[in-house]
Amino acid sequence: MQPISPGAAVLVVGAGITGRAVLAALAPLGARATLTDDSPTALTASAQQRVEVLDPATAVDRIADFDLVVVSPGIPPTAPIPVAAAAAGIPVWGDVELAWHLDRSGRFGPPRQWLVVTGTNGKTTTTSMLYAMLQAGGRRAVLCGNIGDPVLSQLDRPADVLAVELSSFQLHWAPSLRPEAGAVLNVAEDHLDWHGSMAAYAGDKARALTGRVAVGGLDDAIAAGLLADAPAPVKVGFRLGDPGPGEFGVRDGVLIDNAFGRDLALADADTIPVAGPVGVLDALAAAALARAVDVPAAAIAEALATFHVGRHRAEVVAVADGITYVDDSKATNPHAAQASVSAFPRVVWVAGGLLKGASVDEMVEATKDRLVGVVLIGRDRAIVGNALSRHAPDVPVVELVTGEDSVVLEKDESGVTRVTRVIQTGDRTLADAVMTAAVDAARGLATSGDTVLLAPAGASFDQFTGYGHRGDAFAAAVRAAIR
């Protein structure tokens, strides 16, 4: 029996947004879907909606009853259900793999052109730029994937092209995906706890490069290596410098297509509304994907000139007393934080959170000459502090400790000029207390001409509900402080 033929038994793992999209997609196919989730509350709510449910332990025991397992992207391959399915020879798909099969089947009309964006950092901005370029070029396009709506939920919309942001998790569970064009922007340490190794992480990213056109960042050693090894018949690199044959790049301040055109000018780099080199790289990658499906240069220029940066992505919150306050809470790993700090000449860096096993030494070494002060927050702040002591011992540091997380305070290495402040939350939430103290400390370190930059280099879930919550708390604290 084919995995998604009528009557097929499908186990759906995860009752969140993705799981609900999978259930909705399976219903008209005649498949028999069963939902499992670690949350008994979620299973009870689903059962009340007449969804067949199983607890995870029972699902493992009965894994042989299923023809297909569809997992939410956060489920690692080492989880009990994927392990049991693999041992039983049962295919395990993600929602993107299911969407790919359904789109290729013609169930929703002629198959779309998939343009896929992945990378450790810059995915959302690049995919958004790509979508704007497609729209400016008159294409019927849909923006989907990790950026918001699951691909599955968008297949019934009239479209010729899908601009799809995909994470390494989603790519891991999409082995058959062959996009019209796909880009790997960059690859740096992230999610190693999920993938198990850097090689496995990079290998999953490389699945974006298995279609007709592969696009890769040449200024990133790992991305460039993945591009060189890609099976795609057309390979296109992009770089900040002068582009060679088959490349996109920058010449005399102008974005140039030397791959699908011959030294074709696309747009002035100074029209890109994302600060620093990272904005130029994102625009080059988006332009390469757009040009792969024949979007004209004029449409690319129009899209970049009118593009708006998303929330919490190098977003200027305020300027007061000559100090610029920037929310880049989306910089949730050291690679992203390095790019963020590198966009400004003098930075008071607000950093910390959950590093997920990543090292910050390379990032601190690369940006130390830009740092005029550092404010450390969050669970792994001592790791950042120790990196500062090794590579930037003259930079003043204020470390913020709360009663809630002081248990994880580690012994600091000597060398850093460090002040430790214990936060008292009082009647405030932890998030408000942390950011109020962080902004107060940062203002004390900054002078006119400096940038106070929230670019944490870590995930937010130790003290906030997400990077958006963290950024909102920062912005609120800034506005309160400068009144």
UniProtKB/Swiss-Prot annotation:
InterPro entries recorded: Mur-like_cat_sf, Mur_ligase_C, Mur_ligase_C_dom_sf, Mur_ligase_cen, MurD
EC main group: ligase
Pfam families assigned to the protein according to its UniProt record, in alphabetical order: Mur_ligase_C, Mur_ligase_M, MurD-like_N
The EC number(s) this enzyme carries: 6.3.2.9
Main localization of the protein described in the UniProt heading: cytoplasm
Catalysed transformations (reactions): UDP-N-acetyl-alpha-D-muramoyl-L-alanine + D-glutamate + ATP = UDP-N-acetyl-alpha-D-muramoyl-L-alanyl-D-glutamate + ADP + phosphate + H(+)
Keywords for this protein: ATP-binding, Cell cycle, Cell division, Cell shape, Cell wall biogenesis/degradation, Cytoplasm, Ligase, Nucleotide-binding, Peptidoglycan synthesis
Gene Ontology BP annotations: cell division; cell wall organization; peptidoglycan biosynthetic process; regulation of cell shape
Gene Ontology molecular function terms on file: ATP binding; UDP-N-acetylmuramoylalanine-D-glutamate ligase activity
SUPFAM superfamilies: MurCD N-terminal domain, MurD-like peptide ligases, catalytic domain, MurD-like peptide ligases, peptide-binding domain
Subcellular locations according to the entry: Cytoplasm
Signal peptide: none
Binding site for ATP: 119-125
Pathway: Cell wall biogenesis; peptidoglycan biosynthesis
Annotated GO CC locations: cytoplasm
Cystine crosslinks: none
General function of this protein: Cell wall formation. Catalyzes the addition of glutamate to the nucleotide precursor UDP-N-acetylmuramoyl-L-alanine (UMA).
Family: Belongs to the MurCDEF family.
Name of this chain's protein: UDP-N-acetylmuramoylalanine--D-glutamate ligase
